[in-house]
């Protein structure tokens, strides 16, 4: 997104939006690179950012409901941004699709004497249930006699939001 926000196309779009007093918000992985119109006040901007940062279908649905509610008092009310785990062990059989602790995961999936493979993948793939390749890896590794510890975490770490560093994730799991 960094490069897109520096493009002449975006600059032209931004000028058009500003000249016509059209509010806009552009999220970016690097929070300092995000852009928004001056007409969006701090509380609204913070709520937009939380919906985007926390991710997932319900947060994006509620982002649009929230934005709509800013202009229509009769609109469906948005739920507040919902925080999901920043990191965990993927467990497709669990109700939440993850385990928070290694001991919980080991209780649900005893390794026995099998060698354990670690698999680290992006949190967004877990949030959006985009885990087909992870599931295929689990299935194939188990066929070959391995146990797998599939851990998800953020690729871009914002410790101010409470995200653990990659080192912390690896030490924890």
Regions found by a protein language model. Name each.
Residues 1-173:
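An N-terminal assembly and electron-transfer interface module characteristic of large anaerobic redox
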């Amino acid at each position: 997104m960094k490069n897109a926000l520096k493009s002449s196309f975006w600059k032209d779009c931004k000028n058009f939006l500003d000249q016509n007093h059209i509010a806009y918000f552009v999220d970016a992985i690097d929070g300092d690179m995000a852009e928004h119109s001056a007409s969006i006040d701090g509380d609204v901007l913070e709520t937009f950012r939380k919906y985007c940062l926390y991710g997932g279908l319900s947060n994006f649905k509620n982002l649009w409901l929230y934005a709509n509610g800013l202009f229509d008092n009769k609109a469906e009310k948005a739920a507040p941004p919902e925080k999901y785990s920043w990191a965990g062990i993927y467990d497709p059989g669990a109700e939440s699709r993850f385990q928070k602790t290694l001991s919980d995961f080991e209780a649900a999936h005893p390794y026995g004497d099998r060698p354990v493979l670690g698999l680290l993948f992006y949190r967004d793939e877990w949030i959006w249930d985009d885990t087909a390749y992870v599931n295929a890896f689990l299935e194939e590794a188990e066929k070959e006699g391995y146990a797998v510890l599939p851990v998800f975490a953020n690729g871009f770490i914002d410790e101010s939001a409470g995200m653990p560093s990659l080192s912390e994730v690896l030490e924890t799991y």
